């Protein structure tokens, strides 16, 4: 992408001195705004299929009686496929990067790479989730997986983390 000063794009390509640099396409954007893509800073992409599912319930009841039992039945392929569905929705609204905090981070990463979506995977650290060793392995593996993928630790919620867990994370 080159946002120029009104000079000819081919002339710009030649001026760079980079061999083989040519413009594939030139678009006159005069009178328009060119913006970077939006970033969704908190997603659970594969939950796209659960939208409006028992949404008239209090949070804890909704989680414990509806969401957690449904999630227990989801496969890795479900997470992959539903993440791809969510990515289609993101792209139609200008979202080009997500911070995904859902289950099965390797499948989310694979779906994002296959769809060309930038993703920061955030493990929702909590007292019920995987051990810190698993989190460390994910950190090392997923951060090397693909340039579109990053991994970081994140706190699920204050009510699902103990003080001891947070202290252990700070020592990592």
Residue ranges and their predicted role:
Residues 1-35:
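Histidine-rich, glycine-flanked metal-binding segment
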Residues 6-8, 39, 51:
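Residue-level structural signal for beta-strand termini and adjacent loop
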